[in-house]
């Protein structure tokens, strides 16, 4: 069997190649370039040339052929353009998930097959099992601190049938040890950070290359607003209703985020100084205050703390909502601010993906799974409720910063990743 290893220059893919070679497979390595910064769209420490050099040295050390493939056109069309589009809508995409489903196990797989590969192997910390009928299961990696199954949540059966994850049963220290013992050039290389196969990037600068800056208000919302909010009161009451009694509209209501657009600020005139110069100011508002300015609501994301430039508080300030239509960013004080906390999210029917189609839920069904809404989040107990108007995830405990555009991923008790979907809200 001929196997192509996606060699990135990092220690994980290097050890994956090493193990396959030792196991007697016919192995070759291929490095993919996913970006040409010819238009100045990205300014960052991408270091892809150094990564390629290290990858080639690793392949030479192991004794396997090395190839290079340029997938920058596919990456721009399927990942980068999608990122810009989502941020422009006020959503927060996950490019690493798309990089795997659209690039590594699609365009890269196709390129590998042209070189005669039967399978593609990567350095992901996850496990794959093949059932007697040929169906593939994907499970969390053995190392709980490095499990990367989340990033593979959009893979389908065809892709999984051609995938191998040689280090899925190993712990990170074991991988480092194997690399050091084999004297691989990547043994001491730090784990990669930043956008998948592009590198460490200043994201606001990256986005501003394509998305226009536009100043707007940063509005701090006080607890008093929630005390008078009918929507907030309704959500609290619906959470007390038995799940089987919740209608489709009830679930929609629970999953919808709070709407702060009704917060308005009136102005008044006053005279200042010895010359009694006439000036204008905002009238005091018991529910909110204009706390600062920003350069564009699309550059901010739910739960964001850095880059707000708002001081004078005893607790940290977090983004609780953005409105790109009105170009407003809403913030709240404290990690437990009411605007950060929710228990229900919705995934549109067309956005629901089941890794094993046989596990697909039908409208009217409810199942309990373990769910995470971001990479490395501890798994959360939740009830999945399938209705005609979407798949709803109702968590047992309140969740912080449920973010539109991110992926919700659900697992069985044995660690099998069963499905995923883009969070609508």
Task: Give the location of each predicted region.
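ATP-dependent adenylation/nucleotidyltransferase module used to activate substrates
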Residues: 1-154, 164, 172-181, 246, ...
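AMP-forming adenylation/ATP pyrophosphatase catalytic core
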Residues: 121-126, 137-425
């Amino acid at each position: 069997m001929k196997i192509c290893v996606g060699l990135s220059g990092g220690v994980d893919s290097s050890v994956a190649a090493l193990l396959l070679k030792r196991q007697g497979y016919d192995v070759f390595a291929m490095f993919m370039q996913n970006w040409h910064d010819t238009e100045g769209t990205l300014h960052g420490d991408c270091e892809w040339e150094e990564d390629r050099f290290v990858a080639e040295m690793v392949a030479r050390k192991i004794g396997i052929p090395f190839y290079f493939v340029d997938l920058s056109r596919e990456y721009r069309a399927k990942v980068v353009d999608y990122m810009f589009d989502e941020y422009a809508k006020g959503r927060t995409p996950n490019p690493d998930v798309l990089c795997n489903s659209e690039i590594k196990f699609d365009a890269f797989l196709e390129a590998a097959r042209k070189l005669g590969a039967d399978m593609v192997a990567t350095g992901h910390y996850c496990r794959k099992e093949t059932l007697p009928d040929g169906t593939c299961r994907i499970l969390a990696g053995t190392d709980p601190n490095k499990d990367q199954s989340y990033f593979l949540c959009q893979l389908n059966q065809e892709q999984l049938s051609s995938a191998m994850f040689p280090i899925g049963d190993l712990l990170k220290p074991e991988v480092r040890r194997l690399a050091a013992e084999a004297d691989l050039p990547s043994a001491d290389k730090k784990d990669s950070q930043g956008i998948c196969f592009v590198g460490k990037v200043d994201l606001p600068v990256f986005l501003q290359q394509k998305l226009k800056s536009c100043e707007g208000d940063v509005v701090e919302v006080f607890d008093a607003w929630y005390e008078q909010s009918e929507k907030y009161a309704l959500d609290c009451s619906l959470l007390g209703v038995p799940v089987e009694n919740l209608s489709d509209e009830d679930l929609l209501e629970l999953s919808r985020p709070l709407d702060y657009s009704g917060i308005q600020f009136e102005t008044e005139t006053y005279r200042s100084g010895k010359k009694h110069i006439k000036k204008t100011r905002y009238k005091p508002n018991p529910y909110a205050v204009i706390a600062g300015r920003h350069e564009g609501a699309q550059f901010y994301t739910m739960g964001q703390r850095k880059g707000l430039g708002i001081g004078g508080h005893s607790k940290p300030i977090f983004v609780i909502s953005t409105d790109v239509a009105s170009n407003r960013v809403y913030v709240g004080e404290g990690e437990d601010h009411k605007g950060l906390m929710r228990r229900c999210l919705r995934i549109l029917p067309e956005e629901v993906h089941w890794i094993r189609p046989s596990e697909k839920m039908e409208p009217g069904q409810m199942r309990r799974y373990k769910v995470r809404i971001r990479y490395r989040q501890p798994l959360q107990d939740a009830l999945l409720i399938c209705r005609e108007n979407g798949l709803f995830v109702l968590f047992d405990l309140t969740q912080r910063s449920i973010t539109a555009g991110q992926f919700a991923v659900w697992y069985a008790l044995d660690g099998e990743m069963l499905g995923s979907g883009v969070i609508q809200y």
